[in-house]
């Protein structure tokens, strides 16, 4: 994947369901080390995902993520385009291998570089619309540790 320009990015995610709910805006503090994590964050919020498969396609990038959450397989297909230094756009769709879970609608997203990260933000920080900040880099490390601490297929496994 391309490397996002370091600094503060505003990412707007729009659900493609009709009628469409209001878009969700998040702020991301990005550096070279967190670029990939932040770039795929709109469509990679699950545990149990393999490393994304990335290929160049149609003047941009095609990304596929395979995940398994509590035995349910999910495949997310995403497309990304842009210069990745001032702006990028993308879309994604997740297919869930279950008849008991509703298929989520397709989503579109757009990232725009705003400048330097806000004071107090560190690379990997994602500021949600409710002003809560989570650090995706720390979350990824914690999820990796969690995945190795116990067997997700064990009977009665819960989060």
Where on the chain are the PLM-derived regions?
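Mid-chain, structured segments of secreted extracytoplasmic proteins
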Residues: 35-79
């Amino acid at each position: 994947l391309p490397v996002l320009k370091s600094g503060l990015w505003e990412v707007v995610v729009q659900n493609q369901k009709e009628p469409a709910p209001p878009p969700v805006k998040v702020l991301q503090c990005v550096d070279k080390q967190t670029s990939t994590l932040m770039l795929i964050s709109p469509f990679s919020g699950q545990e149990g995902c393999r490393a994304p498969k990335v290929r160049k396609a149609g003047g941009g990038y095609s990304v596929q993520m395979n995940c398994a959450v509590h035995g349910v397989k999910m495949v997310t297909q995403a497309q990304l385009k842009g210069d990745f230094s001032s702006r990028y756009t993308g879309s994604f769709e997740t297919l869930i291998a279950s008849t008991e879970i509703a298929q989520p609608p397709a989503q579109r997203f757009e990232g725009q570089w705003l400048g330097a990260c806000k004071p107090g933000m560190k690379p990997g920080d994602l500021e949600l619309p409710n002003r809560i900040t989570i650090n995706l880099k720390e979350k990824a490390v914690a999820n990796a540790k969690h995945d190795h601490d116990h067997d997700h297929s064990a009977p009665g496994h819960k989060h």
